Design a protein with these regions (language model features):
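Intrinsically disordered, low-complexity, Lys/Arg-biased terminal tails
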Residues: 134, 142-205
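EF-hand Ca2+-binding helix-loop-helix modules
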Residues: 1-30, 35-38, 51-57, 65-123
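Extended, charged alpha-helical interaction scaffolds
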Residues: 94-161
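Generic structural motif recognizing short loop/turn segments at the entrances and edges of beta-strands
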Residues: 43, 51-55, 158
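A short structural micro-motif
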Residues: 61-62, 177
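Amphipathic regulatory helices of Ca2+-sensor modules
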Residues: 33-46, 69-83, 126-141, 164-177
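Short helix/strand-bridging catalytic loops that position acidic/His residues to coordinate divalent metals
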Residues: 59-61, 153
């Protein structure tokens, strides 16, 4: 069950400003912000659509579909972010980025969201390797295992897809295992994917 977002108290004027901001970017024929609206919002925020802050925004807004924000997601998300215009949204996203990088529990929540956000089809439980690499590159920053793991994924041929256990396993691995894998313990029952990664690292130190 998804945890309910803590929505701060707000004024009628602030509600109107959030509604106005949603209306500015929403699709003319749908009551949602679609890809074109997201692109315009990104331009106004002065960020690339592939920037980490856009994924952070989707996370804080509880977005269910990549590239889209429903009215409730957008307006309640702005409320959660304590923002009611582009300027305050930009500032809030910068603060969220700092918190994610300094609070392990917050980062883990963001990291877990990133995988689920990539599941675009009903009953989908896996993501392809290319999507995994792209998402890892956005979500993780300055992590010692990130680039070596990406190199491994690009060179290996056994795995075409990644599941949630493997995705979360890499998070735990990145936190618990030394950059050179010297303290890696097979007895901890890591996903086989990570056993193979360690073997790759031993061959490519």
């Amino acid at each position: 069950m998804r945890r309910a977002k803590k929505v701060p108290k707000t004024s009628a004027k602030a509600d109107e400003r959030r509604e106005s901001l949603f209306d500015k970017y929403k699709d003319p024929s749908e009551d949602s912000v679609g890809p074109e609206g997201v692109e315009r919002l990104c331009r106004d925020l002065q960020v690339d659509p592939a920037d980490r802050k856009v994924l952070l925004m989707a996370w804080k807004m509880g977005a269910q579909q990549m590239g889209f924000f429903s009215r409730s997601e957008f307006e309640q998300g702005l409320q959660v972010l304590n923002a009611n215009d582009v300027h305050t949204l930009k500032t809030s996203l910068e603060q969220v980025a700092i918190k994610v990088d300094h609070d392990p529990d917050v980062f883990q929540s963001f990291y877990q969201f990133a995988f689920k956000f990539c599941l675009t089809e009903p009953r989908q439980k896996i993501i392809d390797i290319e999507t995994c690499i792209q998402m890892l590159s956005i979500v993780m920053t300055n992590q010692a295992h990130l680039q070596p793991f990406i190199d491994f994924l690009q060179h290996q041929t056994e795995y075409k897809f990644i599941n949630n256990d493997q995705w979360m396993g890499f998070y735990r691995f990145s936190v618990e295992v030394a950059p050179d894998c010297s303290d890696y313990d097979e007895a901890q029952a890591w996903p086989l994917l990570l056993d193979n990664y360690v073997e790759y690292r031993q061959k490519h130190p």
